[in-house]
Amino acid sequence: MITLKEALKYSKEELENLKKELNEKAKKEKKLGAYIEQFLDKDLSVSGEGVPVAIKDNISVKGWELTSASKILQGYIAPYDASAIVNLKANGFSPFGRCNMDEFAMGSSTASSCYGKTLNPLNFERVPGGSSGGSAAAVAGGLALASLGSDTGGSVRQPAAFCGCVGFKPSYGRVSRYGLASYSSSLDQIGVLTQNVEDAAILYDAIAGYDKMDSTSANIEFIKTVPNLNANKKLKIAVIENYVNDADSEVKNALLKTIDMLKANGHEIVYKNLLDSKFDIAAYYIIATAEASANLSRYDGVRYGKRSENIQNLKEMYVNTRSEGFGEEVKRRILLGTFVLSSGYYDAYYIKAQKARAFIKAKYEEILQDCDLIFMPVTPTTAFKFDTQKSPMQTYLEDVYTISVNLAGLGGISVPVAKDKEGLNISAQLICKAYDEQTLLDGALSLEQMIKN
């Protein structure tokens, strides 16, 4: 598979041939479920001029159906381009194909989609991760040069780690959320999934920057990262020792070897600890579900998508539309979010979760005061088998090392470093100070080149 960097040098005719080739390949690999099948019936080669980039099903592309992999939004056609898509097109890229995802980005396996599950291209019995599992599977499976996803608590980095590609979540506000179907507004961030770190930098440079259409967009000077990429920069890296030690033995051993390589290549390694991850999980699922219960209240059968036909009055329209339209996991999170925001529990849960979030952010800032980057696992295990997570809590624990990065609003990247005995990918996660993506990408490029050599 050619890289984004190589494809940007293609002529218009070469790009058209590439798109036709990718389209045919995607149709042959329908079993993988990386793309939403109904979308493959369209001629994706006419998606516009530019290098093709696959798009997660919660990012608006004008004229495309946007469903967030939910029955309740089927039939909704986006009337405008998301700001990230506007920037994408302005920089020589074109949207190409709708990637499958967990419904409303709520999940870690891409098994809750109303279109059916996505498989892991490394092993069809394993999950691709989520919620951007389709985006990761498309890139890792050779069906896309790169893709856009969204990351609320690890939804770009975790599937990238499970499928064996690079997953990069910029700092909160660095990429506009205008045109992204909201799950949790204070945590959501559009990210990129690519074949390598340089491509991640190229795609990030194309979509990042301040946007007046998004009130949470960071009005901070944005300097392109690609011209300044430097894999030879020597960095001070804080290894989160308690997280590395708590990971599965194969993941732990791979990360320890990676740390030794970083030392051997001249990076300064120091050892730090973060809070017990149970605080991250509690704070994240209270805040995220509270915001989701508010954001998803707009899907009631009045303005968007499907409306139940089995109705006699207004109340039945609301109840039946939402009962029929939302999947089990989405209903679970809406109920939890409504509960923690209720008058009797707001102080006991939501306010305490926000205090915990501030504490988590302060701990990261303390470590990053005298370190350039943080190093830790992306996931505690490699990709798990379908239907082995017996409870929602087991599924939630898959994001244990990624959610705190969103709570703190920092940038994070997942880089493949090893394979386990079954050939499944193991990745390392690097984390930077807010809006210091240049250092993050420099460190990731250094790590990637070390692994290749």
Swiss-Prot record:
Q: How does it assemble?
A: Heterotrimer of A, B and C subunits.
Database matches in InterPro entries: Amidase, Amidase_CS, Amidase_dom, AS_sf, GatA
Keyword terms: ATP-binding, Ligase, Nucleotide-binding, Protein biosynthesis
GO-annotated cellular components: glutamyl-tRNA(Gln) amidotransferase complex
Active site at which residues?
56, 131, 155
Q: Which organism is it from?
A: Campylobacter jejuni subsp. jejuni serotype O:2 (strain ATCC 700819 / NCTC 11168)
User: Pfam families from the xrefs?
Assistant: Amidase
Q: Which GO terms describe its molecular function?
A: ATP binding; glutaminyl-tRNA synthase (glutamine-hydrolyzing) activity
Functional summary from the UniProt entry:
Allows the formation of correctly charged Gln-tRNA(Gln) through the transamidation of misacylated Glu-tRNA(Gln) in organisms which lack glutaminyl-tRNA synthetase. The reaction takes place in the presence of glutamine and ATP through an activated gamma-phospho-Glu-tRNA(Gln).
Q: Name one GO biological process term.
A: translation
The family this protein is said to belong to = Belongs to the amidase family. GatA subfamily.
Q: What does it catalyze?
A: L-glutamyl-tRNA(Gln) + L-glutamine + ATP + H2O = L-glutaminyl-tRNA(Gln) + L-glutamate + ADP + phosphate + H(+)
User: Which Enzyme Commission number(s) are listed?
Assistant: 6.3.5.7
PANTHER family in alphabetical order: GLUTAMYL-TRNA(GLN) AMIDOTRANSFERASE SUBUNIT A, TRANSAMIDASE
Instruction: Give the SUPFAM superfamilies listed for this entry.
Output: Amidase signature (AS) enzymes
Q: What is this protein called?
A: Glutamyl-tRNA(Gln) amidotransferase subunit A
